[in-house]
A protein has these predicted regions:
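Glycosyltransferase specificity loop/lid
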Residues: 1-111
Length: 111
């Protein structure tokens, strides 16, 4: 069967939705792996799904918690700017690291 890579914004709700999809793919006989910054692995609870940590240099320990605190802060007009900046950083990390990781892990399709 195929090896599917799951890539989502670094938010628990997005990971939960993708994890449900990944579980269904595993039930159908596929291999499924999340690809993201190391700290995002904590949001996975389905042991059937793999996790490939990428972006170690761009996302050092503590960076995900800091990003979550900044995005969750409802105060002021800068919240949308912080969200966009955080997503741009994540996108840059994925663009830099994901292609090689997908090749290394012989991924057939990306969701």
């Amino acid at each position: 069967m195929s090896h599917f890579a799951l890539v989502a914004p670094p938010y628990p709700s997005h990971f939960a939705a993708m994890q449900a999809l990944g579980g269904e793919l595993v039930e159908r006989g596929h291999q499924v792996s999340f690809f993201h910054q190391p700290e995002a692995e904590r949001w996975l609870s389905d042991s059937r799904l793999g996790f490939v940590a990428i972006g170690h240099a761009e996302c050092p320990p503590g960076s995900l918690d800091l990003a979550m605190r900044r995005v969750a802060d409802p105060a002021g007009p800068l919240r949308p700017r912080r969200l966009i900046k955080q997503l741009a950083h994540t996108t840059g990390m994925l663009i830099s690291n994901l292609p090689q990781a997908l090749r290394d892990h012989r991924v057939d399709a990306v969701i």
